[in-house]
């Protein structure tokens, strides 16, 4: 049985996690689930996701952190905080580089472009 939802959807042969990592994954997943309850209140959702991000930092499954970064970026984007959104999408991409075959890299690039467009800064992304 896969050890976490993000790992399950991105890796057909997930490696087992230590007990501490499993607890951290569960706590972060709980924060994400709480976030989904506040999907229309992006400030509350952002707080839940930032808690999940702090739990995920330093774990061996960096793709989990990448997933959280992308969700935070989407919340910032909905709040009109495009610079913060851009940074989160860039962090998401950076945290996914060691696992390029995972689904989140493509999504993060798409979100990064979408975040740059309203500001007219898409040319920065191309450099």
Swiss-Prot record:
* Organism encoding this protein: Rickettsia conorii (strain ATCC VR-613 / Malish 7)
Looking up InterPro entries in the UniProt record yields: TPR-like_helical_dom_sf
Q: What is this protein called?
A: Uncharacterized protein RC0135
Domain of life, per UniProt, equals Bacteria
């Amino acid at each position: 049985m896969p050890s976490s939802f993000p790992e399950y959807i991105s890796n057909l042969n997930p490696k087992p996690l230590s007990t501490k990592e499993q607890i951290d994954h569960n706590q972060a997943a709980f924060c994400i689930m709480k976030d989904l309850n506040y999907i229309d209140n992006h400030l509350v959702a952002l707080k839940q996701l930032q808690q999940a991000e702090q739990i995920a930092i330093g774990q061996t499954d960096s793709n989990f952190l990448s997933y959280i970064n992308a969700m935070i970026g989407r919340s910032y984007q909905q709040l009109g905080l495009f610079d913060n959104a851009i940074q989160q999408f860039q962090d998401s991409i950076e945290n996914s580089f060691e696992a390029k075959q995972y689904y989140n890299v493509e999504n993060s690039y798409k979100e990064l472009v979408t975040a740059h467009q309203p500001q007219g800064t898409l040319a920065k992304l191309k450099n």
